[in-house]
Swiss-Prot record:
Site, Seems to be a necessary countercharge to the potassium cations: residue positions: 248
The protein, known as: Betaine aldehyde dehydrogenase
Name of the gene encoding the protein in the UniProt record: betB
Pathway(s) served: Amine and polyamine biosynthesis; betaine biosynthesis via choline pathway; betaine from betaine aldehyde: step 1/1
InterPro entries recorded: Ald_DH/histidinol_DH (IPR016161), Ald_DH_C (IPR016163), Ald_DH_CS_CYS (IPR016160), Ald_DH_CS_GLU (IPR029510), Ald_DH_N (IPR016162), Aldehyde_DH_dom (IPR015590), BADH (IPR011264)
Names of the cofactor(s): K(+)
Alphabetically ordered keywords of this record: Metal-binding, NAD, NADP, Oxidation, Oxidoreductase, Potassium
Organism: Pseudomonas putida (strain ATCC 47054 / DSM 6125 / CFBP 8728 / NCIMB 11950 / KT2440)
Length: 490
């Protein structure tokens, strides 16, 4: 018997059975335990969710800005009241350490919802004078029914990042969580209903991206799709979204981000930043700075500091708050990461730390991979070029600023980048030349609600968070008003 039984779909403000008996398993990657049997949505369920969302969206959009704001703020309050419960469920489902989910995942997701709840009354149009007797005004109107498709690494946080601006602008959202980690998004749907969100304004459909995701993105009455995931899948989603209608799209995709450490940097601080850029959340963060560039003359000292810090990582049961490094999200993903590690060894990179699956004692039950650091890396190695999405750092050396900027930009990705230096002029000079959408100077990883998040090149389209994201969930209607006479040319 699974701990959480059978998980149903969430449509029109309630849990409902899917149109078929098909289910998939939610598995705890730390132990292999089956947590739940999750129902697979059918195409008929998708249609039911769209119809429900259309009804709910009309009710939601007709409310005043202050009414919508109050409901979203109530959802924030409930999220914070249930923080620990939701965090533990996220830990069980993803394998992320409770020390992380308790203080980050729900907390930061609630912050984003609170941020957009505060912006609801600020959605406004413009008045543009033309001449004494005529002017134009604009209205920002909601799109209608939107779709969010989440990744498996930050399930509830991503659902909040996508739903917060969508709902704030008066839209409805149908959300499809990753098949790997579906549980907390269903709880979010409950919370929205409890807070007073009209039925149908936030529906959750569980199932595979190939089926449920495609049915949603190809649906002609969906107005926007916001997707987080890999670049290859993102391209398919974009093509699918335009196959039946011209939909708005936001894509937050993959990365192979550079962290450049300059010769004048505080090496201890740089090592701390490199650790956060590679091993936070067991390395499963899209913005990770996995290509660490260090001046050649500083390499040995930097390696020593990294090895010392890796030895202090507390790998263990993610339910234990003392643990700060848990398993990977699934056994399938573990095999993918181990394949990259094997490739790194085969291509001549030197293993400084880790480089193996952990199998001692209870580790054997889970998808645990040791924090891994490769050094003596070159730009043409597979581990340097491809996104691994795991706890694998690659150390590379460089000689000049011009060289490292060129090499940092020599990638199809452009999600994030960082610079460590005590020279603020150099910091800005380098950052301004890096082809990345999210950049940090002497820091890594923080993405507050106010900060637009998104990539260059094949790392994404559009932005999440920040004021500009709210506008992406509206469309502008322009209205010209003539107060005087009208002269026809006929």
């Amino acid at each position: 018997m699974a701990r959480f039984g059978t998980q149903k779909l969430y449509i029109d403000g309630a849990y409902v059975d899917a149109g078929s008996d098909a289910t998939f398993e939610a598995i705890n990657p730390a132990t292999g335990e089956v947590l739940a049997h999750v129902q697979r949505a059918t195409e008929a369920d998708v249609e039911k969710a769209v119809e429900s969302a259309e009804r709910g969206q009309k009710v939601w959009a007709a409310m005043t800005a202050m009414q919508r704001s109050r409901i979203l703020r109530r959802a924030v309050d409930i999220l914070r009241e249930r923080n620990d419960e939701l965090a533990m469920l996220e830990t069980l489902d993803t394998g992320k350490s409770y020390s992380e989910t308790r203080y980050v995942d729900i907390v930061t997701g609630a912050d984003v919802l609170e941020y957009y709840a505060g912006l609801v009354p600020a959605i406004e149009g413009e008045q543009i004078p033309l001449r004494e007797s005529s002017f134009v005004y604009t209205r920002r109107e909601p799109l209608g029914v939107t779709v969010g498709i989440g990744a498996w690494n930050y399930p509830i946080q991503i659902a909040l990042w996508k739903s917060a601006p969508a709902l704030a602008a008066g839209n409805a959202m149908i959300f499809k969580p990753s098949e790997v980690t579906s549980l907390t998004t269903l709880k979010l749907a409950e919370i929205y209903t409890e807070a007073g969100l009209p039925n149908g304004v936030f529906n959750v459909l569980t199932g595979s991206g190939r089926e449920v995701g495609t049915w949603l993105t190809e649906h002609p009455r969906i107005e926007k799709v916001s997707f987080t995931g890999g670049t290859t899948t993102g391209k398919k989603v974009m093509a699918s979204a335009s196959s039946s209608s011209l939909k708005e799209v936001t894509m937050e995709l993959g990365g192979k981000s550079p962290l450049i450490i300059c010769a004048d940097a505080d090496l201890d601080k740089a090592a701390d930043i490199a650790m956060m850029a590679n091993f936070y959340s067991s390395g499963q963060v899209c913005t990770n700075g996995t290509r660490v560039f260090i001046p050649a003359e500083m390499k040995a000292a930097f390696e020593a500091k990294i090895a010392e810090r890796v030895a202090r990582i507390r790998v263990g049961n993610p339910e234990d708050e003392n643990t700060n490094f848990g398993p990977l999200v699934s056994f399938q993903h573990m095999e993918s990461v181990l394949g990259y590690i094997a490739k790194g060894k085969e291509e001549g990179a030197r293993v400084l730390c880790g480089g193996e699956r952990l199998t001692a004692g209870d580790f054997a039950k889970g998808a645990f991979v040791a924090p891994t650091v490769f050094t003596d890396c070159t730009d043409d190695m597979t581990i340097v070029k491809e996104e691994i999405f795991g706890p694998v750092m690659s150390i590379l050396t460089y000689e000049t600023e011009e060289e490292v900027i060129r090499r940092a930009n020599d990638t199809d990705y452009g999600l994030a980048a960082g610079v460590c230096t005590n020279d603020i002029t150099r910091a800005h000079r380098i950052i301004h030349k890096l082809e990345a959408g999210i950049c940090w100077i002497n820091a890594w990883g923080e993405s507050p609600a106010e900060m637009p998040v998104g990539g260059y090149k094949q790392s994404g389209v559009g932005r999440e968070n920040g004021v500009s994201s709210l506008a992406q969930y509206t469309r502008i209607k322009s209205v010209q008003v003539e107060l005087g006479g009208y002269n026809s040319v006929f």
